[in-house]
Amino acid sequence: IGVIATAVIATLVPKDRGETAPLAFRDELKVVGRPQVLLGLLMTVLGFGGMFTVYTYIQPLLTEVAGFAESAVSPILLVFGVGMIVGNLLGGKFADRKLMPALLATLATLTLVMGLMTFALHSQWAMVLFVGLLGAAAFATVSPLQLWVLQKAEGAQSLASSLNIGAFNLGNAFGAWLGGAVIMHGAGLGALTWVGALVPLSALLVALYSVSLQKRSDRLLVAAESNAA
């Protein structure tokens, strides 16, 4: 699989022919410290954290709440995997076309899917469907989140990309912790989906704030150019 992946990357990924000199590490740190970059990293943590609030505990959700046999868990997770592939493809296409709408739409979709999953917990067929939708909705956010951070970190994309991967992993840990806290404090497995939905909802609110900052910055730039003319 690794050899195939390497061949595909070498064939399809465009070669960077730019001659731009890399920034010094100190300057890269200044770039990734920009408010828009930090907001993007926060969106990544919250966006993926919500999904892992549920996914970390997907086995007991399926067996203890939905009533599936243990042997059914692995086939159902294959449905999640198919959803991941579909979500990655769709998220990448949407992000390439219109990044800002793609970012907002994918976070909103993830919030909606997780919220509605609350009402599917006791229906086996509905749960299979929503497990697939969860995979698709969660991984549709990956490309928009990554591209948003890279665009806002112009000149320090390598460092920003590394930090964003770390943000995805931090989201994984945060989601697992949050799900465990929900269960430990007695809310039960059934509360994981709606509590988890609040996390990408908060990511969506951060995204809306980030977009408003971007629009304000664009207006100021246009005004400055008009005054200079």
What are these regions (language model features)?
Residues 148-159:
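Paired intracellular helix-loop junctions of major facilitator superfamily
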Residues 86-99, 183-184:
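Helix-to-loop junctions at the C-terminal end of transmembrane segments
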Residues 99-145:
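C-terminal transmembrane helical hairpin of 12-TM major facilitator-type secondary transporters
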Residues 1-19, 206-211:
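C-terminal membrane-cytosol helix-exit motif in multi-pass small-molecule transporters
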Residues 10-43:
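Juxtamembrane intracellular "pre-TM" segments in multi-pass secondary transporters
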Residues 23, 209-229:
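Intrinsic disorder in cytosolic terminal tails and internal cytosolic loops
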Residues 35-78, 82-85, 99:
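Extracytoplasmic gate region of multi-pass secondary transporters
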Residues 1, 69, 181-201:
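A membrane-interface helix-boundary motif in multi-pass transporters
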